[in-house]
Amino acid sequence: MTSRTEAVKAYLLDLQDRICSALETEDGGARFVEDAWVREAGGGGRTRVIGDGKVIEKGGVNFSHVFGAGLPPSASAHRPELAGRGFEALGVSLVIHPHNPHVPTSHANVRFFIAEKEGEEAVWWFGGGFDLTPYYGNEEDCIHWHRVAEQACAPFGADVYPRYKAWCDRYFHLKHRGEPRGIGGLFFDDLNEWDFDTCFAFIRAIGDAYVNAYLPIVQRRKDTPYTPQQREFQEYRRGRYVEFNLVYDRGTLFGLQSGGRTESILMSLPPQVRWGYDWKAAPGSEEARLTEYFLQDRDWLGQ
C-alpha cells in the first residue's frame, strides 16, 4: 500500500468504529456483530451488522479493501481508458433500516479507488455521499438533513453542495417508476478535481457529517406511535429501495462483478418488504403526500 492508501484506510476503519458506536448508543439495545472476511482474489473487510434492536430493525456498516488485476465493467464503463488496469478499492458503506415508519432509512458511503498500470501514472479518485429515504415525510427532517450536507460542503466552495445535491437527485432515481428513491442529499464520484489532500479532507468532512445529519432525526421520530397500516406502507415503500439497489446501484454492481462478498453487498436490503399489484395511496393521505410533495427534486434550503 502507498502512504495515501494507508491514510485513507486508517480513516475509514476509524469512521466505521465511530459510526457503529454512535448507532449502538442511540439504539440502546442491540449491538453490532462483526464478521471479518478475506477475499480470495485479494483483500477483505469487516462487515458489521445490527438487528432487532429498540430502534434499528436491520442495519450494516461495512468496511472493505479489495484489489485485483483489472477493473470490473461497472467501474470502467464511463472511463474506458481505465479498462485493464489493476485496481485497489477501499470504502465504508452503511444502510440503516429502522422499525418505526416515521424514522427514515439512511444510506452513506465514502470510497477511494486507485487504478494502476505498469509504466503509467496511477489514477485515483474518491466517491461517496449520503441520502435519506423517508416513508412519512417531515419538512423539519428534510431541511436538517440538507443543512448538514451544505455545511459539510461549504469549506470546499459555494458550488459544491448544489452540484452534488443535484447529482444525488439524478443518481437515486428509479427510471422505471419515474420517481426518486428518497429526498436525496449528496452524491459524487470520480472526485479528483482538487489535489489529493483537499479531496481526502472533503471525504472526511462528508463521512464525519453523517451521524450529525441522521441521529437528530432518529431522536425526534423514534417514539412516534404508528399503526399496522403505516407499517405496511413502510414495507411497500421499501420495495423501491430493493428495486434501486438491485437494478441501478453502482456499488452493488461493482461488488458483484468484482467477486465481492455477496452477504456484505446485499446487507443493504431491508428485512421485510412487500409488493402490491398497482397499489395506490388514498387521495389526500399522508401516503399520497410522500410522492406528491416529498419525493420531488426540491430545493429544501431555498424554499
Swiss-Prot record:
One cellular component term from this protein's GO annotations in UniProt: cytoplasm
Q: Which reaction does it catalyse?
A: coproporphyrinogen III + O2 + 2 H(+) = protoporphyrinogen IX + 2 CO2 + 2 H2O
Q: List the residue(s) that the UniProt entry marks as the site Important for dimerization.
A: H176
- What cofactor(s) does the depicted protein rely on? a divalent metal cation
Tell me the Pfam families matching this sequence. Answer: Coprogen_oxidas (PF01218)
Q: Name one GO molecular function term.
A: protein homodimerization activity
Does Cell membrane show up as a keyword for this record?
A: no
Where is the protein localized? Answer: Cytoplasm
Provide the residue positions that the database annotates as binding a divalent metal cation.
Answer: H97, H107, H146, H176
SUPFAM superfamilies, sorted: Coproporphyrinogen III oxidase
| Gene3D superfamilies documented for this protein | Coproporphyrinogen III oxidase, aerobic
- Which InterPro entries does this one have? Coprogen_oxidase_aer, Coprogen_oxidase_aer_sf, Coprogen_oxidase_CS
Q: What is its EC number?
A: 1.3.3.3
Which parts of the sequence bind substrate?
S93, N109, V110, R111, G259, G260, R261
Q: What class of enzyme is it?
A: oxidoreductase
Q: What keywords does the record list, in alphabetical order?
A: Cytoplasm, Heme biosynthesis, Metal-binding, Oxidoreductase, Porphyrin biosynthesis
Region: Important for dimerization; residue ranges are 241-276
**What function does this protein fulfil?**
Involved in the heme biosynthesis. Catalyzes the aerobic oxidative decarboxylation of propionate groups of rings A and B of coproporphyrinogen-III to yield the vinyl groups in protoporphyrinogen-IX.
Family per record: Belongs to the aerobic coproporphyrinogen-III oxidase family.
How does this protein assemble?
Homodimer.
Its protein name is Oxygen-dependent coproporphyrinogen-III oxidase
